[in-house]
């Protein structure tokens, strides 16, 4: 009996010692109680992408192979080309033998055939949903003429984004010596991709079928299961190779708050998805959406001369919401900037914008419009007003 009691006490002491000496990774967030998050993956990062604030990180600058998360840069260059007008979603892409080959041998594939003609939008779906290496190669060749030239464009764009620890060797993420990036750099390119919201239409789709022009329809199933099972998830990209293990750049939005989680080197897809979900849930608990300016609300009364009736109301063209940390005491300020060089202002005409700052950081802006037709006071008008004031004061 005494022996059992000693064993019991010894066991309790071991548990107590283990709990006291365990050192979990902690959240990097100023001005709050630091929570504890356990991450098994080799590297991880949680960001609020609107401000770029890093909420959590673990080995965020460690160079690791990203597998198909590479395709975030491929999609970014494609979306930039679309949004700049360089290409259109309806443009046709002819699939090369090289593109088809990159989708064979057990690699992720959209099942494209040599000579097959697909639109830019269909190829984007193949990259975003099916993670097709053939689709990524077809897009690369269409945009830059060859995959080699496209990879140069990828690395050039990475440098401009400040991705200091990234080197791309291909457009798909296939294993290749020296093809590396970091969780932090992935967050940077993911943050930039989110500036092209059209892409979320593709990355947030779970299943899609492309049948036009084919005997056998192409069935696309998203490798990112979080878009189906995690509330608000609409992207961005998963990745796996035996070298990289399981990776993801995941994003979700709830109640106007968007978060971005990066996981690299998770041992299996269940842990990858669980840890990305845990990070995003933590992010949602730390931030909230605030409506700062309502559409059509008065922002500024703009005087156009010395006469009291020479003014217009600058109103907001649309709502402006911002994301702030819960409990933050940082001052929120509005700075209206109105064009005063015009002689005449038309009702409904855009006359400037209003900037919103949290502390000294610009977090958003909204266009302003005039609420009326009005002519600016001229020199003669102002002189007459001054004479009237002199006369009234004399009387």
Please provide the spans of the model-predicted regions.
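Sterically constrained small-residue positions within well-ordered secondary structures
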Residues: 20, 35-37, 252, 344-345
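Structural motif marking the loop-to-transmembrane transition
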Residues: 4-5, 66, 116, 120, ...
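Active-site-adjacent loops and short helices of periplasmic peptidoglycan-processing enzymes
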Residues: 24-197
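Sec-dependent N-terminal signal peptides of Gram-positive bacterial secreted proteins and lipoproteins
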Residues: 2-28
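Hydrophobic alpha-helical membrane context
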Residues: 17-18, 83, 287
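Domain-terminus/edge residues, biased toward the C-terminal soluble/receptor-binding domains
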Residues: 163-167, 175-395
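A generic local structural motif
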Residues: 2, 30-32, 247
